[in-house]
Amino acid sequence: FVREKSNLAKTTYFLNASYNLKINSRWFLKVGFQDEIMGLDLNYKTKEQLFAPEKQIWDYKSSTNLVQGYAHIKYGFSKNLTLNAGLHANYFLLNNSTAIEPRFGLVYNVSQKSSFNFGYGLHSQLQPINVYFLQSIDNNGNTVYNNKNLDFTKSNHYVIGYNLQPAQDWRIKTEIYYQRLYNVPVNTFSSSYSMLNTGARFNTELEDNLINKGTGTNYGLELTVEKFFSKGYYGLFTSSIFDSKYTGSDGVERNTAFNGKYVYNILVGKEWNVGAGKRNKTSIDFKFTNAGGRYYTPIDVASSQTTGREQLSTNVYSSQYPSYTRMDIKFGYTFNSKVKKLSQTFSLDIQNVTNHKNVFSQSYDDRNQNVSWKYQLGFFPNFVYKIQF
């Protein structure tokens, strides 16, 4: 028995200003700032037993700000070598945490059709805003916010890439990257928990004893082959091979929930001019995606049967879902008016043509005393009518 009452609302306003200055043919300067004003109305209660009192998880109604400032310079050493460098600063008013981020990149043009690039950047990220306001009751009966002083999660990011234009309307891009994360929120006690896995189980984060002492590592290789739209057709192939690990407060390195190891996408489309005067168009688009499955913590069926509630295994993120596969096809026909700037498009978008069963999540079914699986959207035809004028 679990009962929840929630009202989690966030309203955001942005104030932006920037200034650009071209000093000469080699130097370019840009400075600016952004103030993100977050209006929050968080109220969440949970009740896990029928006759138990409700537990207040969030009860906060106010606002806070994330202020950012930056300075960026671009300098051309020559026609073939360009430097981009800058500083980015963050200030979070809620707990006065700050982050200064140096970044720079070099681009070397080997020829008019190919170039190398290298980049480094220190990047900082706020935690999900509701995490700061998780509340609990201390021994004196006072409401406390143990996560309120969490710092930014930070990462050092290194990239080396190569770009090639082998023919007109074609581009090939490859990139190798390495990312080292630190200041990741983990439990104050020894555990496998890490904020890096937030969102993997589609549930509400209720960890209220966090500290910025976790780490993580991501690295991989990406390849993109693109045919820009011309002569009535286009194409795009993207792929990535990667590894993603994290370390919790127990000091053990594990796969992150999102460590699918690989993903690739194929997108192609063709368009024909038809009808009187070739004004109308018919088209077909094809998309195919295949990705390694996410890692997950299996359910301990025996313990769940004993307690009557879902109990997870101690082998955290030790199992992997089957790979994700999906194929979409879209057919379209566009009527263009002869005398008016008016067009009408009819299209049939068939999603997951093969009706492949992609795993969404697992849960414990108390009635059948076994694991129950939920799946993502299956075969789904979608008819669309659009008018433009």
Regions of interest found by a model, annotated:
Residues 1-95, 173, 236:
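Face-selective signature of the C-terminal outer-membrane beta-barrel domain
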Residues 8, 12-18, 57-68, 151, ...:
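Outer membrane beta-barrel strand-and-loop segments of large Gram-negative receptors
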Residues 9-13, 61-67, 98-100, 154-158, ...:
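Residues that define the transmembrane beta-barrel architecture of outer-membrane proteins
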Residues 22-26, 80, 113, 169, ...:
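Short loop/turn motifs that connect adjacent beta-strands in outer-membrane beta-barrel proteins
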Residues 31-37, 85-89, 118-122, 174-180, ...:
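Transmembrane beta-barrel strands of outer-membrane/channel proteins
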Residues 46-48, 93, 113-157, 178-204, ...:
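Surface-exposed extracellular loop regions of Gram-negative outer-membrane beta-barrel proteins
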Residues 178, 202-293:
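Gram-negative outer-membrane beta-barrel transporters
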Residues 235, 277-279, 289-308, 324-326, ...:
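C-terminal beta-signal and adjacent terminal beta-strands/loops
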